[in-house]
Amino acid sequence: MSTDQQSSVEDQTVAMVNVRRANFKSFWDKYSDKPDTNSMMLNHSAEELESSDRADILASLPLLHNKDVVDIGAGIGRFTTVLAETARWVLSTDFIDSFIKKNQERNAHLGNINYQVGDAVGLKMESNSVDLVFTNWLMMYLSDEETVEFIFNCMRWLRSHGIVHLRESCSEPSTGRSKAKSMHDTANANPTHYRFSSLYINLLRAIRYRDVDNKLWRFNVQWSCSVPTYIKRSNNWRQVHWLAEKVPAEDGAKGTSFNELVELIKNTWQNEQEAWDAKLDDEKYVWTDKVFSSALTSLPSNSTFFLYTPRTVSPYCHINAHTLAETFNANVWNTEIIPEYYRTSLTKSNNLKDQRVRFGWNQSLTDSVTYWQQKDALFDVFVATEFLSTVDDETIRQLPNVMSDGAKFITLEPVDEVNEAEMKQRIQELGYTLKSFTDVTDQCIEAQEQYFKDHEQLRDEKVIRKNWVLLELTH
Protein backbone atom coordinates (compact mmCIF):
# COMPACT_ATOMS: atom_id res chain seq x y z
CA MET A 1 0.00 0.00 0.00
CA SER A 2 1.39 3.42 -0.95
CA THR A 3 1.72 6.28 1.52
CA ASP A 4 -1.15 8.14 -0.19
CA GLN A 5 -3.39 5.04 -0.07
CA GLN A 6 -2.57 4.45 3.61
CA SER A 7 -3.31 8.09 4.39
CA SER A 8 -6.64 7.81 2.56
CA VAL A 9 -7.61 4.69 4.54
CA GLU A 10 -6.66 6.37 7.81
CA ASP A 11 -8.71 9.46 6.89
CA GLN A 12 -11.71 7.26 6.07
CA THR A 13 -11.33 5.40 9.36
CA VAL A 14 -11.17 8.64 11.35
CA ALA A 15 -14.24 9.91 9.48
CA MET A 16 -16.18 6.72 10.26
CA VAL A 17 -15.24 6.95 13.95
CA ASN A 18 -16.30 10.61 14.07
CA VAL A 19 -19.66 9.77 12.49
CA ARG A 20 -20.16 6.95 14.95
CA ARG A 21 -19.34 9.14 17.97
CA ALA A 22 -21.70 11.80 16.59
CA ASN A 23 -24.45 9.16 16.39
CA PHE A 24 -23.90 8.17 20.02
CA LYS A 25 -23.78 11.83 21.07
CA SER A 26 -27.09 12.39 19.26
CA PHE A 27 -28.53 9.26 20.89
CA TRP A 28 -27.78 10.57 24.40
CA ASP A 29 -28.56 14.21 23.62
CA LYS A 30 -32.22 13.15 23.36
CA TYR A 31 -32.15 12.54 27.11
CA SER A 32 -29.90 15.47 28.10
CA ASP A 33 -32.84 17.73 28.99
CA LYS A 34 -33.86 15.23 31.68
CA PRO A 35 -30.73 14.48 33.72
CA ASP A 36 -32.42 12.01 36.06
CA THR A 37 -32.21 8.34 37.01
CA ASN A 38 -34.67 7.21 34.33
CA SER A 39 -32.52 8.80 31.63
CA MET A 40 -29.35 7.27 33.06
CA MET A 41 -30.85 3.78 32.95
CA LEU A 42 -33.04 4.30 29.84
CA ASN A 43 -35.87 2.76 31.81
CA HIS A 44 -39.23 4.32 32.71
CA SER A 45 -39.26 2.21 35.90
CA ALA A 46 -35.68 2.99 36.92
CA GLU A 47 -36.59 4.73 40.16
CA GLU A 48 -38.07 1.45 41.42
CA LEU A 49 -34.79 -0.44 41.13
CA GLU A 50 -32.02 2.19 41.12
CA SER A 51 -31.01 2.04 44.79
CA SER A 52 -31.02 -1.76 44.83
CA ASP A 53 -29.04 -1.96 41.59
CA ARG A 54 -26.53 0.59 42.90
CA ALA A 55 -26.13 -1.35 46.15
CA ASP A 56 -25.46 -4.57 44.20
CA ILE A 57 -22.69 -2.95 42.19
CA LEU A 58 -21.05 -1.11 45.08
CA ALA A 59 -21.08 -4.24 47.25
CA SER A 60 -18.92 -5.96 44.64
CA LEU A 61 -16.09 -3.41 44.81
CA PRO A 62 -12.92 -3.63 46.90
CA LEU A 63 -12.29 -1.23 49.78
CA LEU A 64 -11.43 2.23 48.45
CA HIS A 65 -9.86 3.93 51.49
CA ASN A 66 -6.84 5.96 50.31
CA LYS A 67 -7.54 4.91 46.71
CA ASP A 68 -7.85 7.04 43.56
CA VAL A 69 -10.81 6.32 41.28
CA VAL A 70 -12.02 7.30 37.83
CA ASP A 71 -15.78 6.97 37.20
CA ILE A 72 -16.18 6.84 33.41
CA GLY A 73 -19.59 7.48 31.88
CA ALA A 74 -20.64 8.75 35.30
CA GLY A 75 -23.78 10.54 34.12
CA ILE A 76 -25.50 12.41 36.95
CA GLY A 77 -23.17 10.76 39.46
CA ARG A 78 -25.31 8.05 41.03
CA PHE A 79 -22.11 6.07 41.74
CA THR A 80 -19.73 9.03 42.01
CA THR A 81 -21.25 10.11 45.33
CA VAL A 82 -20.62 6.83 47.14
CA LEU A 83 -17.21 6.31 45.53
CA ALA A 84 -16.11 9.76 46.71
CA GLU A 85 -17.37 9.16 50.25
CA THR A 86 -14.72 6.47 50.75
CA ALA A 87 -12.02 7.07 48.11
CA ARG A 88 -9.20 9.59 48.41
CA TRP A 89 -9.98 11.20 45.04
CA VAL A 90 -12.45 10.66 42.18
CA LEU A 91 -12.46 11.86 38.58
CA SER A 92 -16.06 11.80 37.31
CA THR A 93 -16.47 11.96 33.53
CA ASP A 94 -19.29 11.93 30.98
CA PHE A 95 -19.73 13.31 27.46
CA ILE A 96 -23.11 14.98 28.12
CA ASP A 97 -22.63 18.43 29.65
CA SER A 98 -26.04 18.56 31.39
CA PHE A 99 -25.35 15.24 33.11
CA ILE A 100 -22.05 16.49 34.53
CA LYS A 101 -23.69 19.73 35.70
CA LYS A 102 -26.30 17.69 37.58
CA ASN A 103 -23.49 15.52 38.93
CA GLN A 104 -21.69 18.60 40.27
CA GLU A 105 -24.89 19.90 41.88
CA ARG A 106 -25.66 16.70 43.76
CA ASN A 107 -22.04 16.28 44.90
CA ALA A 108 -21.23 19.91 45.73
CA HIS A 109 -20.73 18.94 49.39
CA LEU A 110 -17.80 16.66 48.48
CA GLY A 111 -14.42 18.28 47.90
CA ASN A 112 -12.48 15.34 46.49
CA ILE A 113 -14.14 15.10 43.05
CA ASN A 114 -12.87 16.48 39.75
CA TYR A 115 -15.24 16.64 36.78
CA GLN A 116 -14.59 16.33 33.08
CA VAL A 117 -16.90 16.53 30.07
CA GLY A 118 -15.63 14.30 27.31
CA ASP A 119 -15.82 11.03 25.44
CA ALA A 120 -14.56 7.92 27.23
CA VAL A 121 -12.53 6.96 24.16
CA GLY A 122 -10.67 10.27 24.17
CA LEU A 123 -10.11 10.44 27.93
CA LYS A 124 -6.53 11.45 28.78
CA MET A 125 -5.01 10.34 32.07
CA GLU A 126 -1.51 9.66 33.32
CA SER A 127 -0.22 6.11 33.28
CA ASN A 128 -0.35 4.31 36.65
CA SER A 129 -2.54 7.07 38.11
CA VAL A 130 -5.60 5.29 39.56
CA ASP A 131 -6.46 2.26 41.68
CA LEU A 132 -9.96 1.69 40.28
CA VAL A 133 -11.41 2.22 36.82
CA PHE A 134 -15.17 2.10 37.35
CA THR A 135 -17.70 1.79 34.55
CA ASN A 136 -21.38 0.94 34.51
CA TRP A 137 -22.88 0.52 31.02
CA LEU A 138 -20.11 1.91 28.84
CA MET A 139 -18.62 -0.54 26.33
CA MET A 140 -22.06 -1.29 24.89
CA TYR A 141 -21.84 2.25 23.48
CA LEU A 142 -18.40 1.66 21.93
CA SER A 143 -17.46 -0.01 18.67
CA ASP A 144 -15.31 -3.15 18.76
CA GLU A 145 -12.24 -1.06 17.97
CA GLU A 146 -13.07 1.46 20.68
CA THR A 147 -13.74 -1.32 23.18
CA VAL A 148 -10.28 -2.81 22.62
CA GLU A 149 -8.70 0.64 22.83
CA PHE A 150 -10.55 1.34 26.06
CA ILE A 151 -9.36 -1.91 27.69
CA PHE A 152 -5.76 -1.06 26.71
CA ASN A 153 -6.27 2.38 28.30
CA CYS A 154 -7.64 0.81 31.49
CA MET A 155 -4.48 -1.25 31.73
CA ARG A 156 -2.33 1.83 31.19
CA TRP A 157 -4.19 4.01 33.71
CA LEU A 158 -4.22 1.44 36.50
CA ARG A 159 -1.47 1.04 39.04
CA SER A 160 -0.09 -2.41 39.76
CA HIS A 161 -2.87 -4.54 41.32
CA GLY A 162 -5.41 -1.87 40.42
CA ILE A 163 -8.97 -2.98 39.68
CA VAL A 164 -11.32 -2.45 36.75
CA HIS A 165 -15.07 -2.90 37.22
CA LEU A 166 -17.19 -3.31 34.10
CA ARG A 167 -20.94 -3.81 33.76
CA GLU A 168 -22.83 -4.27 30.50
CA SER A 169 -26.18 -5.26 29.04
CA CYS A 170 -25.37 -8.53 27.30
CA SER A 171 -27.42 -9.86 24.37
CA GLU A 172 -30.40 -7.59 25.14
CA PRO A 173 -31.25 -4.26 26.86
CA SER A 174 -31.51 -3.93 30.63
CA THR A 175 -35.30 -3.88 30.22
CA GLY A 176 -35.11 -7.25 28.49
CA ARG A 177 -37.76 -7.54 25.80
CA SER A 178 -40.18 -5.14 27.50
CA LYS A 179 -40.90 -2.19 25.22
CA ALA A 180 -43.15 -0.59 27.84
CA LYS A 181 -40.27 -0.06 30.27
CA SER A 182 -37.62 0.90 27.71
CA MET A 183 -36.94 4.55 26.88
CA HIS A 184 -35.20 3.65 23.62
CA ASP A 185 -36.73 5.52 20.69
CA THR A 186 -38.16 2.74 18.53
CA ALA A 187 -38.51 5.11 15.57
CA ASN A 188 -34.74 5.55 15.29
CA ALA A 189 -31.83 3.13 15.17
CA ASN A 190 -30.40 2.07 18.50
CA PRO A 191 -26.58 2.25 18.17
CA THR A 192 -25.99 0.04 21.22
CA HIS A 193 -23.92 -3.18 21.07
CA TYR A 194 -25.49 -5.93 23.19
CA ARG A 195 -22.48 -8.24 23.02
CA PHE A 196 -22.20 -11.77 24.34
CA SER A 197 -20.95 -11.87 27.94
CA SER A 198 -18.24 -14.31 26.84
CA LEU A 199 -16.67 -11.70 24.55
CA TYR A 200 -15.88 -9.41 27.47
CA ILE A 201 -14.42 -12.24 29.54
CA ASN A 202 -12.27 -13.39 26.63
CA LEU A 203 -11.06 -9.86 25.91
CA LEU A 204 -10.07 -9.20 29.51
CA ARG A 205 -8.25 -12.53 29.70
CA ALA A 206 -6.48 -12.17 26.35
CA ILE A 207 -4.93 -8.73 26.61
CA ARG A 208 -1.20 -8.49 27.35
CA TYR A 209 -0.01 -4.89 27.69
CA ARG A 210 3.63 -3.77 27.55
CA ASP A 211 4.30 -0.52 29.42
CA VAL A 212 6.99 2.13 28.80
CA ASP A 213 9.38 0.21 31.07
CA ASN A 214 8.97 -2.88 28.85
CA LYS A 215 7.08 -4.72 31.58
CA LEU A 216 4.23 -6.96 30.47
CA TRP A 217 0.86 -6.95 32.26
CA ARG A 218 -2.38 -8.92 32.12
CA PHE A 219 -5.77 -8.91 33.85
CA ASN A 220 -6.66 -11.51 36.45
CA VAL A 221 -10.43 -11.72 35.92
CA GLN A 222 -11.70 -12.51 39.40
CA TRP A 223 -15.34 -13.18 38.54
CA SER A 224 -18.33 -12.61 36.29
CA CYS A 225 -21.92 -12.71 37.52
CA SER A 226 -25.39 -11.32 36.92
CA VAL A 227 -26.62 -8.25 38.80
CA PRO A 228 -29.10 -9.65 41.37
CA THR A 229 -31.58 -6.77 41.22
CA TYR A 230 -32.26 -7.36 37.54
CA ILE A 231 -32.95 -11.02 38.18
CA LYS A 232 -35.36 -10.21 41.01
CA ARG A 233 -37.12 -7.27 39.33
CA SER A 234 -36.88 -8.05 35.61
CA ASN A 235 -36.10 -11.77 35.25
CA ASN A 236 -32.96 -10.70 33.39
CA TRP A 237 -29.75 -12.70 33.96
CA ARG A 238 -27.96 -10.81 31.18
CA GLN A 239 -27.08 -7.74 33.21
CA VAL A 240 -23.51 -8.88 33.81
CA HIS A 241 -20.55 -7.35 35.61
CA TRP A 242 -16.90 -8.27 36.01
CA LEU A 243 -14.00 -7.47 38.30
CA ALA A 244 -10.42 -7.77 37.05
CA GLU A 245 -7.05 -6.98 38.62
CA LYS A 246 -3.95 -5.68 36.82
CA VAL A 247 -1.12 -8.13 37.55
CA PRO A 248 2.27 -8.97 35.98
CA ALA A 249 1.92 -11.24 32.96
CA GLU A 250 2.98 -14.87 33.18
CA ASP A 251 6.55 -15.84 32.27
CA GLY A 252 7.03 -16.22 28.55
CA ALA A 253 3.94 -14.21 27.63
CA LYS A 254 3.93 -11.99 24.56
CA GLY A 255 2.16 -8.70 24.05
CA THR A 256 -1.15 -8.67 22.17
CA SER A 257 -1.68 -6.24 19.32
CA PHE A 258 -4.67 -3.98 18.86
CA ASN A 259 -5.55 -5.54 15.49
CA GLU A 260 -5.30 -9.06 16.88
CA LEU A 261 -7.79 -8.32 19.66
CA VAL A 262 -10.17 -6.49 17.33
CA GLU A 263 -10.28 -9.52 15.01
CA LEU A 264 -10.93 -11.82 17.97
CA ILE A 265 -13.82 -9.80 19.42
CA LYS A 266 -15.34 -8.87 16.05
CA ASN A 267 -15.20 -12.30 14.42
CA THR A 268 -13.43 -15.23 16.09
CA TRP A 269 -15.05 -15.18 19.54
CA GLN A 270 -18.40 -14.12 18.09
CA ASN A 271 -18.44 -17.08 15.70
CA GLU A 272 -17.33 -19.52 18.39
CA GLN A 273 -20.12 -18.39 20.71
CA GLU A 274 -22.73 -18.67 17.99
CA ALA A 275 -21.57 -22.22 17.25
CA TRP A 276 -21.97 -23.23 20.91
CA ASP A 277 -25.34 -21.46 21.12
CA ALA A 278 -26.57 -23.59 18.21
CA LYS A 279 -25.61 -26.74 20.11
CA LEU A 280 -26.56 -25.87 23.68
CA ASP A 281 -29.38 -23.30 23.64
CA ASP A 282 -32.03 -25.91 22.82
CA GLU A 283 -30.82 -28.51 25.32
CA LYS A 284 -33.95 -30.36 26.50
CA TYR A 285 -32.32 -32.01 29.50
CA VAL A 286 -28.84 -32.95 30.78
CA TRP A 287 -27.60 -36.52 30.44
CA THR A 288 -26.31 -36.55 34.02
CA ASP A 289 -29.87 -36.09 35.39
CA LYS A 290 -30.57 -39.80 35.80
CA VAL A 291 -27.03 -40.58 36.97
CA PHE A 292 -27.26 -38.14 39.87
CA SER A 293 -30.87 -38.94 40.78
CA SER A 294 -30.11 -41.87 43.11
CA ALA A 295 -27.54 -39.90 45.11
CA LEU A 296 -29.80 -36.88 45.48
CA THR A 297 -32.99 -38.54 46.70
CA SER A 298 -32.13 -38.18 50.40
CA LEU A 299 -31.33 -34.47 50.30
CA PRO A 300 -33.60 -32.13 52.30
CA SER A 301 -35.75 -29.49 50.65
CA ASN A 302 -34.91 -25.79 50.94
CA SER A 303 -31.19 -26.52 50.79
CA THR A 304 -28.60 -24.26 49.18
CA PHE A 305 -26.61 -25.93 46.40
CA PHE A 306 -23.11 -25.07 45.19
CA LEU A 307 -22.46 -26.60 41.75
CA TYR A 308 -19.16 -26.92 39.91
CA THR A 309 -19.22 -27.88 36.22
CA PRO A 310 -15.85 -27.47 34.48
CA ARG A 311 -16.97 -29.42 31.36
CA THR A 312 -13.37 -30.44 30.67
CA VAL A 313 -14.14 -33.97 29.55
CA SER A 314 -17.12 -32.85 27.44
CA PRO A 315 -19.21 -29.70 26.88
CA TYR A 316 -22.29 -31.81 27.64
CA CYS A 317 -21.06 -33.15 30.99
CA HIS A 318 -22.63 -30.73 33.44
CA ILE A 319 -25.39 -30.50 36.04
CA ASN A 320 -28.98 -29.40 35.54
CA ALA A 321 -29.23 -26.54 38.02
CA HIS A 322 -32.85 -25.85 37.11
CA THR A 323 -33.94 -29.42 37.83
CA LEU A 324 -32.26 -29.29 41.24
CA ALA A 325 -33.97 -26.00 42.08
CA GLU A 326 -37.35 -27.41 41.09
CA THR A 327 -36.92 -30.80 42.77
CA PHE A 328 -35.62 -29.54 46.11
CA ASN A 329 -37.04 -26.00 46.15
CA ALA A 330 -33.39 -25.05 46.46
CA ASN A 331 -31.34 -21.95 45.80
CA VAL A 332 -28.59 -23.00 43.39
CA TRP A 333 -25.27 -21.37 42.49
CA ASN A 334 -23.49 -22.89 39.51
CA THR A 335 -19.85 -22.10 38.77
CA GLU A 336 -18.87 -22.32 35.11
CA ILE A 337 -15.24 -21.95 33.98
CA ILE A 338 -15.68 -21.83 30.18
CA PRO A 339 -16.98 -18.39 29.06
CA GLU A 340 -18.97 -19.75 26.12
CA TYR A 341 -20.83 -22.31 28.24
CA TYR A 342 -21.43 -19.65 30.89
CA ARG A 343 -23.17 -17.51 28.27
CA THR A 344 -25.45 -20.44 27.26
CA SER A 345 -26.31 -20.98 30.94
CA LEU A 346 -27.41 -17.35 31.22
CA THR A 347 -29.57 -17.82 28.13
CA LYS A 348 -31.25 -20.85 29.67
CA SER A 349 -31.88 -18.89 32.87
CA ASN A 350 -33.45 -16.04 30.93
CA ASN A 351 -35.75 -18.49 29.19
CA LEU A 352 -36.78 -20.51 32.27
CA LYS A 353 -36.92 -17.53 34.66
CA ASP A 354 -36.35 -19.49 37.87
CA GLN A 355 -34.92 -16.90 40.26
CA ARG A 356 -33.60 -19.61 42.57
CA VAL A 357 -30.91 -20.39 39.98
CA ARG A 358 -27.82 -18.23 39.53
CA PHE A 359 -24.71 -18.74 37.42
CA GLY A 360 -21.25 -17.29 37.87
CA TRP A 361 -18.05 -17.57 35.88
CA ASN A 362 -14.63 -18.02 37.48
CA GLN A 363 -11.31 -19.12 36.05
CA SER A 364 -11.26 -21.95 38.58
CA LEU A 365 -13.08 -23.40 41.57
CA THR A 366 -10.38 -21.75 43.68
CA ASP A 367 -11.59 -18.30 42.59
CA SER A 368 -15.21 -19.26 43.20
CA VAL A 369 -14.45 -20.44 46.75
CA THR A 370 -12.56 -17.19 47.39
CA TYR A 371 -15.53 -15.19 46.05
CA TRP A 372 -17.94 -16.89 48.47
CA GLN A 373 -15.55 -16.76 51.42
CA GLN A 374 -15.41 -12.98 51.00
CA LYS A 375 -19.21 -12.94 51.24
CA ASP A 376 -19.27 -15.26 54.29
CA ALA A 377 -21.57 -17.65 52.42
CA LEU A 378 -22.40 -21.21 53.45
CA PHE A 379 -23.93 -23.93 51.26
CA ASP A 380 -25.61 -27.19 52.30
CA VAL A 381 -24.81 -29.38 49.30
CA PHE A 382 -21.91 -29.45 46.84
CA VAL A 383 -22.56 -31.22 43.54
CA ALA A 384 -19.90 -31.46 40.84
CA THR A 385 -18.59 -33.16 37.78
CA GLU A 386 -14.83 -33.75 37.48
CA PHE A 387 -14.19 -32.34 40.94
CA LEU A 388 -11.27 -34.57 41.90
CA SER A 389 -9.83 -34.67 38.39
CA THR A 390 -9.69 -30.90 37.75
CA VAL A 391 -9.22 -29.21 41.15
CA ASP A 392 -5.95 -28.89 43.05
CA ASP A 393 -5.65 -30.50 46.47
CA GLU A 394 -5.40 -27.21 48.35
CA THR A 395 -8.72 -25.96 46.95
CA ILE A 396 -10.38 -29.30 47.73
CA ARG A 397 -9.25 -28.85 51.34
CA GLN A 398 -10.51 -25.24 51.39
CA LEU A 399 -13.97 -26.02 49.97
CA PRO A 400 -15.54 -26.87 53.38
CA ASN A 401 -14.93 -23.22 54.38
CA VAL A 402 -18.00 -22.30 52.32
CA MET A 403 -20.06 -25.34 53.34
CA SER A 404 -22.29 -25.69 56.40
CA ASP A 405 -21.73 -28.29 59.12
CA GLY A 406 -22.88 -31.68 57.92
CA ALA A 407 -22.81 -30.63 54.27
CA LYS A 408 -22.91 -33.33 51.61
CA PHE A 409 -20.48 -33.55 48.69
CA ILE A 410 -21.49 -35.46 45.55
CA THR A 411 -19.32 -35.73 42.44
CA LEU A 412 -19.38 -37.62 39.15
CA GLU A 413 -15.82 -38.52 38.15
CA PRO A 414 -14.35 -39.88 34.89
CA VAL A 415 -11.55 -42.30 35.82
CA ASP A 416 -9.07 -44.48 33.99
CA GLU A 417 -9.66 -47.36 36.37
CA VAL A 418 -12.46 -48.13 38.83
CA ASN A 419 -10.51 -48.58 42.06
CA GLU A 420 -12.46 -47.93 45.25
CA ALA A 421 -9.56 -48.55 47.65
CA GLU A 422 -7.30 -46.09 45.85
CA MET A 423 -10.06 -43.46 45.68
CA LYS A 424 -10.89 -43.91 49.36
CA GLN A 425 -7.27 -43.36 50.35
CA ARG A 426 -6.98 -40.17 48.32
CA ILE A 427 -10.21 -38.79 49.73
CA GLN A 428 -9.09 -39.48 53.29
CA GLU A 429 -5.79 -37.70 52.62
CA LEU A 430 -7.82 -34.66 51.55
CA GLY A 431 -9.76 -34.64 54.82
CA TYR A 432 -13.01 -36.23 53.60
CA THR A 433 -14.85 -39.47 54.30
CA LEU A 434 -16.09 -41.64 51.43
CA LYS A 435 -19.71 -42.55 52.20
CA SER A 436 -20.63 -44.13 48.87
CA PHE A 437 -18.73 -45.33 45.78
CA THR A 438 -20.74 -46.45 42.74
CA ASP A 439 -19.51 -47.59 39.36
CA VAL A 440 -21.89 -45.86 36.94
CA THR A 441 -19.94 -46.45 33.72
CA ASP A 442 -22.70 -48.29 31.86
CA GLN A 443 -25.34 -45.84 33.01
CA CYS A 444 -23.26 -42.84 31.87
CA ILE A 445 -22.58 -44.29 28.44
CA GLU A 446 -26.24 -45.21 27.91
CA ALA A 447 -27.34 -41.77 29.11
CA GLN A 448 -24.99 -40.03 26.68
CA GLU A 449 -26.13 -42.18 23.77
CA GLN A 450 -29.78 -41.37 24.46
CA TYR A 451 -29.01 -37.68 25.01
CA PHE A 452 -27.34 -37.36 21.61
CA LYS A 453 -30.23 -39.21 19.94
CA ASP A 454 -32.72 -36.84 21.56
CA HIS A 455 -30.89 -33.72 20.36
CA GLU A 456 -30.85 -33.52 16.57
CA GLN A 457 -28.10 -30.88 16.53
CA LEU A 458 -25.80 -33.22 18.50
CA ARG A 459 -26.21 -36.43 16.51
CA ASP A 460 -22.55 -36.36 15.40
CA GLU A 461 -21.10 -35.83 18.88
CA LYS A 462 -18.92 -38.51 20.48
CA VAL A 463 -19.86 -40.44 23.62
CA ILE A 464 -17.15 -40.23 26.31
CA ARG A 465 -16.42 -43.91 26.78
CA LYS A 466 -14.43 -43.65 29.98
CA ASN A 467 -15.07 -45.30 33.31
CA TRP A 468 -17.33 -43.23 35.55
CA VAL A 469 -17.82 -43.32 39.32
CA LEU A 470 -20.35 -41.48 41.49
CA LEU A 471 -19.02 -40.48 44.90
CA GLU A 472 -20.77 -39.24 48.04
CA LEU A 473 -18.49 -37.59 50.60
CA THR A 474 -18.70 -35.88 53.96
CA HIS A 475 -16.18 -33.71 55.75
UniProtKB/Swiss-Prot annotation:
GO cellular component terms listed in the entry, alphabetical order: cytosol
Which example biological process does GO assign this protein?
A: multicellular organismal reproductive process
Q: What class of enzyme is it?
A: transferase
- A GO term for molecular function: N-methyltransferase activity
Q: What is its EC number?
A: 2.1.1.103
Effect of knocking it out?
Necessary at multiple stages in the worm's life cycle, its disruption alters worm growth and development.
One Pfam family per UniProt: Methyltransf_25
Purpose: Catalyzes the first step in the synthesis of phosphocholine by converting phosphoethanolamine into phospho-monomethylethanolamine (N-methylethanolamine phosphate). Phosphocholine is a precursor for phosphatidylcholine, a major component in membranes and a precursor itself in the production of glycoconjugates secreted by parasitic nematodes to avoid host immune responses.
The protein, known as: Phosphoethanolamine N-methyltransferase 1
Recorded source organism is: Caenorhabditis elegans
Quick one: which gene encodes this? Answer: pmt-1
